[in-house]
Amino acid sequence: VALLTKSGIPVINSYFAQGGIAAVTDEDDATALHFEDTIIAGRGLCDYPAVDILVNEGPQRIHELIEAGMHFDMEDGSLALGLEGGHHRKRILHAGGDATGRMVTSFMISKVINNPKIDIFENHSVIGILQENQECYGVRAWNLVTESEELFYADNTFLTLGGTSAIYKRTTNPHTTIGDGLALAFNAGCEIADMEFIQFHPSAIYTESEEAFLISEAVRGEGAYLIDQNGERFMPAIHELAELAPRDIVAQSIYRQMLKYDQEYVWLSLKHLDPQVVKHRFPNIYEKCQELGIDMCDRIPVAPAAHYMVGGVRTDTHGQTNIKRLFICGELASSGIMGANRLASNSLIECLV
């Protein structure tokens, strides 16, 4: 197996995921409920068979990760579960408090690095798909170090190049997420679907420097409130789940408040929460807020930011595109799971399933 990455191996969107992984692991939960929450968040436009695979195979993938040595946060001897927007049950597994993406990807990377059957090619940017008669047989890549083109031949090719969110002024994504994977697939003749759906995360820090550091949805899951310029909550009047409504609803509601008061942000208030719990549960976010001169235990200025490409390259439930032997995985794929809007923390579990 040849693994190509256009930068260093850790620089992937999954690495920056804070909240966690959604999967049914508690006896008080059910896959039917996870299925329903996914469909509701997706505005009914999800592919039902694909969602069924996600929610039913997800718990087994989590079990396999744990058996392989992955450590998730525990509470009283059981998996610690968080609550996020659109979920009617606590089912979000997390690791390192608010560093789930980093912990899971670091764990997987260690397995890859130590696997003698996998060769890693860093600083290799894929610039073309090798194909003939609608059948892929590899890729053309540009070696960013030697500044030369290289060919990689393969029986099966998988593109996992993420989304397009870095083309927006405010984004939670790394700068490499510019849609080059989408362009590659489109130029190769792949079918593209649902590109009208771009998810904006409701709560990214607002600063004058335009840095949009993500404030995990799990912070609202722990009880943080969204308040307007008068210090009043506005989400309870908009949705029954208040601050934990699906992301599209929360992001739209925040934007309307910004227009109403002619402000660039609203406030995420944690004043009423135990500071020690906040620091323990969200150590990385707390540290980042300190760097920016923000007291996380008081209130944080937040505004929506481009976060996730819901649409992408059309695939079946195996990741197969309309071009033989070319597969798409992760955010770049449009398998129908997300519908019009992704349910929080369904992205990492989709990658595992």
Predicted features and spans:
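Glycine-rich FAD pyrophosphate-binding loop
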Residues: 1-21, 27-28
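Conserved redox-cofactor binding core of oxidoreductases
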Residues: 66-148, 153, 160, 204-207, ...
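Short beta-strand to alpha-helix junction loop
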Residues: 46-59, 92-110, 121, 171-179, ...
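An anion/pyrophosphate-binding glycine-rich loop and adjacent beta-alpha core
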Residues: 9, 184, 190-301
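Glycine-rich loop(s) and the adjacent beta-strand/alpha-helix scaffold that form part
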Residues: 156-213, 260, 346-353
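Short hydrophobic core segments
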Residues: 151-162, 185, 231, 326-330
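A glycine-rich dinucleotide-binding beta-alpha-beta segment and adjacent secondary-structure elements
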Residues: 121-122, 127-136, 141-142, 281-333
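Glycine-rich active-site loop/strand segments that organize a redox cofactor
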Residues: 23-54
